[in-house]
Amino acid sequence: MKIKKINNQKVQYFFKVSSKELETQLSSAYEKIKSKVEIKGFRKGHVPRKIFENHFGKNNLYSDALENIVQTKYQEILQKKDFESMGMPQVIDLNEKKLKDNQNFTFGLEFIVKPKVILKKYLGLEITKDELEVKDCEVEEKINSLLEKQATLESKTQNNSLELTDTAVFDFEGFVDEKPFEGGTAKNFSLKIGSGQFLPGFEDQMLGMKQGQNKDINITFPSDYHQKKLANKKVIFKVTLHQIKTKKIPQLTDNLVKLLKLANVSTVEELKNNTKKTLLDQKKHKEKENIKKQVIEQLVKNSELQIPQEIISQEKTHLQKEFEKQLKQQNLTLEQYKQYLGIGDEKMEKEFNQQAQKNLQYRLIIEQVAFQEKLTISKEKIEQQYKNLSNHYKVPVNQIKQNLPEKNLQHSLLMDEALDLVINKAVVVTK
């Protein structure tokens, strides 16, 4: 093994691999898939490697063998603990011809060295926070919002006219150039007036109508209308209003509160107290996040570090993949998301890049705080956190451990402890 230090950011290791070692890994790679191999004339799982290679080629085996060799060498270097690396190493200077000819071959691994962080000040930071208070009007607004959800729609009397926030039930038929157009007709259509659900100007012209009334509504399709052939076209909608419904909000009483079936709440007074507590908890959470943001901003400002672009790119790719997973759960693609928000590729890339840089700055700085303060996480604390997660997600501890390796959990707890230390040592000024 040969070592070559490029600069303070990169270290390269070069290896010689014998044909014998390669053959061992090729055999191992084939043994892993042998039981699934099927070729006519041979029993499943009993196909000789030579026959497999003649039918399917050698590339898959060589790829798996090389991956095993790289992983072995990678672990050897990590165990030496000569330096701290970030991300996965890159394979360099691989002699593929010799590899595929089953000869002795060479390759290298290029590591990104963990950047050095210089912390100028991290204890005694000055942070500001608001006086936490929940006003009566905030409680009232929250309860009114809850009552809104319990509201029912009731029909207005014949003489009443259509007003803002009413729901209209009506028929309509649209005409462009005196001809009906596709999608321009509906029966007993329900529309909340003021919702902006219909074409601009339509709802405004319906205001004041009475049940049973007919009216022609004249509007122009927007220039960016999704049906291009209708864009900028003048349209007449012939409308017949059948019914006007208005929202009736229930009166706040103990009986209504009981019907809501809220935990530990059965009276108006209890609802008010519970709502006040919930709002206060929300403000505390928001305050905690704001303090965390202030601390991180000051730590970044008070630190010196240079993050290699390769690591930022790796983090950016990771963020993008995770974001795409989240979108997939909502049956969306990244392209659809960008179209929906009107964001171009360049802006999206820039946002991912900035977030990647922030994540790395935070991680490296907090890790340095933990190092300088000699913080450690005990086995007991790790096990307790596994139990907490198990109780929270209602799944067995073993399942949590399978999805969250101990090393990752330990690092997460260490980061939390280091950040808490900085926050607890900060000077808090209340506005």
Curated annotation (Swiss-Prot):
Domain spans labelled PPIase FKBP-type: 165-250
Q: Quick one: a GO cellular component term?
A: cytoplasm
EC annotation? Answer: 5.2.1.8
InterPro entries from the entry? PPIase_dom_sf, PPIase_FKBP_dom, Trig_fac, Trigger_fac_C, Trigger_fac_C_sf, Trigger_fac_ribosome-bd_bac, Trigger_fac_ribosome-bd_sf, Trigger_fact/SurA_dom_sf
- Cross-referenced Gene3D superfamilies, in alphabetical order? 3.10.50.40, Trigger factor ribosome-binding domain (3.30.70.1050), Trigger factor, C-terminal domain (1.10.3120.10)
Q: What is its main location?
A: cytoplasm
Cite a single GO MF annotation.
protein folding chaperone
Key words, A-Z: Cell cycle, Cell division, Chaperone, Cytoplasm, Isomerase, Rotamase
Q: Does the keyword Cell division apply?
A: yes
Q: Does the keyword Chaperone apply?
A: yes
Q: Catalyzes what?
A: [protein]-peptidylproline (omega=180) = [protein]-peptidylproline (omega=0)
Instruction: List, alphabetically, the NCBIfam families matched.
Output: tig
Its biological purpose: Involved in protein export. Acts as a chaperone by maintaining the newly synthesized protein in an open conformation. Functions as a peptidyl-prolyl cis-trans isomerase.
Reproduce the free-text note on domains from the UniProt record. Answer: Consists of 3 domains; the N-terminus binds the ribosome, the middle domain has PPIase activity, while the C-terminus has intrinsic chaperone activity on its own.
Q: What is this protein called?
A: Trigger factor
Q: Which gene encodes it?
A: tig
